[in-house]
Amino acid sequence: MDPVIIGVGGPVGAGKTQLVERLTRAMSHEISMAAITNDIYTIEDAKILARTSVLPEERIIGLETGGCPHTAIREDTSMNEAAIEQLKKRFPDLQVIFVESGGDNLSATFSPELVDFSIYVIDVAQGEKIPRKAGQGMIKSDLFVINKTDLAPHVGADLGVMEEDSRVFRKDKPFAFTNLKTDEGLERVQEWIRTDVLMLDLA
């Protein structure tokens, strides 16, 4: 059975790499996982993941995409597709592969031919009005994550406003608030992977 591919997108610094790191740390004992990171000119995110994650280095592939970061996850996904095939051959038991995009704008989305599900991450420090902008990445993602909730009092962001706006534009689609420094809210993301993605509750 092929692994489920989960795209993780969002602006630079929102916490994409940290989310993948925390999820793999929390769930690697129950789910076989691997990760692919996309950077424009470096493989820095892959190095960070290899250094901080519980995943062995051979389960992490870093790609230098060059140019616009969204191209490698939408218009020309061949590099990511090749990396996915490489990981599948290395680890036939894989259940989940994360594909982290390079930091991009609010309109970036994953090609449905590349990923099965997508997570879009923003951080509170970008301002409470960000969800109201309703970028395509936030609207179309299967899970929307608002990270760095601990910064709300320092930047004058009202989490209640962000929640209300998220409910309006997400409608019935799920979203979660997280503080990945302390793992606050991470269980909500884990539960989404277990039930909505892998449907383990039906197994």
UniProtKB/Swiss-Prot annotation:
TM helices/strands, residue ranges: none
CDD domains tied to this protein: UreG
Gene Ontology annotations of biological process type: urea catabolic process
One Gene Ontology cellular component: cytoplasm
Main location, first listed in the record: cytoplasm
Pfam families, per the entry: cobW
Location(s), subcellular: Cytoplasm
Assembly: Homodimer. UreD, UreF and UreG form a complex that acts as a GTP-hydrolysis-dependent molecular chaperone, activating the urease apoprotein by helping to assemble the nickel containing metallocenter of UreC. The UreE protein probably delivers the nickel.
Function: Facilitates the functional incorporation of the urease nickel metallocenter. This process requires GTP hydrolysis, probably effectuated by UreG.
Family: Belongs to the SIMIBI class G3E GTPase family. UreG subfamily.
UniProt name for this protein: Urease accessory protein UreG
Native organism: Kocuria rhizophila (strain ATCC 9341 / DSM 348 / NBRC 103217 / DC2201)
Gene name of this polypeptide: ureG
